[in-house]
Structure formats: C-alpha cells, structure tokens
Amino acid sequence: DEVNEALRACVDHGIYGYVRPSASCLQAAASWQQRRHGFQAKPEWITVTPGIDCAMATAVQAFTDPEDKILINTPIYDPFFEVIEKNDRVIVDSPMVLTNGRYEFDWADFEVKIRGCRMWMFCNPQNPEGRCFTEEELRKAGEICGKYGVWMLSDEIHGDIVYDGRKHIPLASLSEEFCGRTITCTSPSKTFSVAGTA
C-alpha cells in the first residue's frame, strides 16, 4: 500500500523528471543497510541513479579511465560486459570454477589477472548462480585487491533476497579499508518488486 500511495503522490504532483532525493530518503537507505546487514553506511555516501546498470556505469566512469582493465568472474550478470565495453574499458575474465555444484574463485588465476586492473566488478549474491559469498572469500578478494590498489564494485542488488539461513555480507562492511575502496550498488527494485518505478 505504501508503494502505491507514493506512486499516486508522484502522479498527482505531475512532474515526471528526475528529482533530488530527500534527506529522509537517503537516511532510510542507510538505515536499511544497518538494520538488515550490519553495514553502517552514511547518507552522504549515497548517490541515487535511475537503475543498477546506470550506477555501475557511473562508477566505472568515475573510478577508471578509458582502456583501463576491469576484472570480472564469469558466469556473471550479462550487463557487466556492456557496462565495461561501452565505456571503452577492457574486460579481464577470471572464470569461476564449478566444484561440487558450486562456483568458486580460482584464487591463483584471480591474483595473476588482477595485476594491472583498475577495478574488480562482481555480484554478491552472485548472479546468475545466486550464491552468497562467505566472509572468508570476501576478505581474501578484498585483500588481493588492496595489495594491487584495485577498486571494488560490488553489485548487491539481490542482497535482501537470501534463503535457507544464508547471510548476505556487504563487502564494504568488513573493514574501513574495504569500505574506502568499495562502490556498493544496490536498489529497492528486487527487494520490494518495484523495478521501473525510479
């Protein structure tokens, strides 16, 4: 009902352009991260975009330069390819390894290929597989990225949709160092089934 009421208020207002989010909107987003995931995001850290792909493209443009290399781990959400290539960046793939029905990082390959990259882009929970990465995996990836001065872009749009006692851990929540080098992309669109209403 709250979503429908908010949409009606927007329609009644009659202005359909992009608007600057209110302070209460940014505070609500930060508070949600704290309550749901224990991540103490600050409202002033939040930048609102029209969608997750736009958020990723904006981060790629802000934190890398044309011809910079960006590491991904396939299989991955298909728009990652487009975001990287349409912004004239270079894809470096460190494929995940299917082990006992579960995709895992190939750490040796990851560390070799991250050298010379400017950014690592990944999904957590992983899309298309849906697996939540463990704290150990996230820490290891974050430490490797830190060793080589690599920005980390974490697409966490499915972070609120986890089942069977699993827990979503935001990468940026694990340390101040990780927080300072992580761009977290999230959205209410999956959690509340409101895609296309931005």
Regions found by a protein language model. Give the residues of each.
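Conserved PLP-anchoring active-site segment centered on the Schiff-base-forming lysine
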Residues: A62-I84
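A short helix-loop-beta submotif of the ANL/AMP-binding
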Residues: K86-V92
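Short acidic capping loops at alpha-helix termini that bridge into adjacent secondary structure
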Residues: A41-I46, P66-K69, C179-T182
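Active-site PLP attachment segment
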Residues: L174-A198
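Helix C-cap/helix->beta junction micro-motif
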Residues: N87, K147-Y148, F178
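N-terminal small-domain helix-loop-helix segment of the aminotransferase-like
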Residues: D1-G51, T58
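Aromatic/hydrophobic pocket-lining residues that form π-stacking "cages" and hydrophobic walls in ligand
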Residues: F80, A141, L171
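Active-site phosphate-binding strand-loop segment of PLP-dependent enzymes
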Residues: V97-R166
